[in-house]
Swiss-Prot record:
Protein name: Allantoinase
Organism name: Arabidopsis thaliana
Cofactor note: Binds 2 Zn(2+) ions per subunit.
UniProt keyword annotations, A-Z: Hydrolase, Metal-binding, Purine metabolism, Zinc
Family: Belongs to the metallo-dependent hydrolases superfamily. Allantoinase family.
Pathway in which this enzyme or protein is active: Nitrogen metabolism; (S)-allantoin degradation; allantoate from (S)-allantoin: step 1/1
Positions annotated to bind Zn(2+) 2: K195, H231, H292
Obligatory cofactor(s): Zn(2+)
Binding site for Zn(2+) 1: H105, H107, K195, D366
UniProt-listed Enzyme Commission number(s): 3.5.2.5
Entry PTM: Carboxylation allows a single lysine to coordinate two zinc ions.
């Protein structure tokens, strides 16, 4: 009888021990809670991985997160003596843990054109792709973000509807470019920098700028130490021969309408004023960032020369320029239309070479969706279809999948997608797995393969217009943390949209 009573007394104790063990060392699959912002029930925990990308290299170890901040990063050999209190441990094993991606070039089309994308679907796609912060472009929404009043509309549209952190670029257009007080009021309202087009944007309330507008914009930005992003193409007269080769369903017909000389001419003009951004120059403190570079020849040579002279200039390219080539684009498949255009395979190789050597600074998605009917997929008319590639959810596996043959490393991916974008956008609390930074983290399995099809949930609004449909990719995102909240894990999103607006304050 006494033995039986002892057994009954021990059972609750054993159950408690088992429960505590399960609580402290649970696998990611078992985490559930009542916090609607997060799939985790608490805000203090450790994340362990055999592959953690830190500023000091790749380590096997653990990251402690508390209150949305990284409070310690320790190597595996030091972890047990560093763990002062018993808190939950999430062990991801061989999966890679690295800073969340920061995508500085996204069109979410909200407010005004949310039928193209919208904050909810776009930021869900970002979370599912390991993007923890994105910066929304000032055009394709309506109205365009060119004043404090239009920025306020965008801020209101984003509230309680974003699943990751979001910042905004403002627009540099002729109406505000020569009015320093107008630009200052837009910058004071919180945009992270400005964006302009040197060719028609295709959006009526976002007209193109000339080099005078850009020079004046840089002089204002110098006071704020924020960047100017420029779509660098200048229209020139074209000589296109008549004939069947100019069939609008042929991608080569479209390619001829936007030759490399357009990019080269725009960049040459830009670099005539960026000397002012050098140390001691009249626009010192300003910075020029060339978006979505497509031409890897003369345009890139000009940029390299300007950098060598001390101009404050950076340049990005996009996954679609690194993944595709003009030769492989099927007739009438307007999903591949964008501007600048995807160029030939030799150009693609040069882009990879420049990226690997550091001449191209970073990557961005330039996620630019629209309604499927504007893609004219049934007609296949490249000359009339809306230009833009939908890729937001897949930029990490695309970069990894197509980069493997070039020897891309995890540290390089982190530099291109986290570290350098954080510096460009002035998001200094983000971009690295280090103490004091936001706990913006992505966990992913580089070796895991998947097909971009109906069996793999796609969260941006119009999957049918993505050029990546049917592609097999390597690199599956397992979990995404935004300021400590597990916003995406094991294929599920947290129920509430608790992303934070990233507005400039100084």
């Amino acid at each position: 009888m006494e033995r039986t009573l002892l057994q009954w007394r021990l059972l609750p104790l054993l159950a408690l021990i088992v429960a505590l063990f399960s609580f402290f060392f649970a696998s990611p699959r078992s985490l559930q809670g009542n916090n609607k912002c997060s799939l985790l029930p608490h805000d203090h925990y450790w994340i362990s991985s055999k592959r953690i990308v830190t500023p000091n290299g790749l380590i096997s170890g653990s990251v402690e997160v508390k209150g949305g901040i990284i409070v310690s990063v320790v190597k595996e050999v030091d972890w047990h003596k560093s763990q002062r209190s018993r808190v939950k441990v999430i062990d991801y094993g061989e999966a890679v843990l690295m800073p969340g991606l920061i995508d500085v070039h996204v069109h979410l089309d909200d407010p005004g054109r949310s039928e193209w994308e919208g904050f909810p679907s776009g930021t869900k796609a970002a979370a599912a792709g390991g993007i923890t912060t994105l910066v929304d472009m000032p055009l394709n929404s309506f109205p365009s973000t060119v004043s404090p009043e239009t920025l306020k509309l965008k801020i209101e549209a984003a509230k309680n509807r974003i699943h990751v952190d979001v910042g905004f670029w403002g627009g540099l257009v002729p109406d505000n470019a020569l009015n320093s007080s107008a630009l200052e009021s837009l910058l004071d309202a919180g945009v992270l920098g400005l964006k302009s087009f040197m060719c028609p944007s295709g959006i009526n309330d976002f007209p193109m700028t000339n080099i005078t507008h850009i020079k004046e914009g840089l002089s204002v930005l110098a006071k704020y130490k924020r960047p100017l992003l420029v779509h660098a193409e200048i229209e020139r007269d074209l000589e296109i021969e008549d004939g069947s080769e100019n069939d609008p369903r042929s991608y080569l017909t479209y390619l001829k309408t936007r030759p490399t000389s357009w990019e080269e001419g725009a960049i040459r003009n830009l670099l005539s004023v960026t000397e002012n951004t050098r140390i001691g120059g009249s626009a010192e403190g300003a910075h020029l960032h060339i978006v979505h570079l497509s031409d890897a020849s003369s345009s890139l040579d000009l940029i390299k020369e300007a950098k060598g002279k001390g101009d404050s200039v950076t340049v990005e390219t996009c996954p679609h320029y690194l993944a595709f080539s003009a030769e492989e684009i099927p007739e009438g498949d307007t999903r591949f239309k964008c501007s600048p255009p995807i160029r030939d395979a030799a150009n693609r190789e040069k882009l990879w070479e420049a990226l690997m050597e550091g001449d191209i600074d970073m990557l961005s998605s330039d996620h630019s969706p629209t309604k499927p009917e504007l893609k004219l997929m049934s007609d296949g008319n490249f000359l009339k279809a809306w230009g833009g590639i939908s890729s937001l959810q897949f930029v990490l596996p695309i970069t990894w999948s197509y980069g493997k043959k070039y020897g891309v490393t995890l540290e390089q991916v982190t530099s291109w997608w986290s570290d350098r974008p954080s510096k460009l956008a002035g998001l200094h609390s983000k971009g690295a797995v280090t103490v004091g930074k936001h706990a913006d983290l992505v966990v992913w399995e580089p070796e895991a393969e998947f097909d971009v099809d109906e069996d793999h949930p796609i969260h941006f609004k119009h999957p049918s217009i993505s050029a990546y449909l049917g592609r097999r990719l390597s690199g599956k995102v397992v979990s995404t943390f935004v300021r400590g909240n597990l916003v995406f894990g094991e294929g599920k999103h947290a129920s509430d949209a608790c992303g934070s607006l990233q507005l400039a304050t100084t």
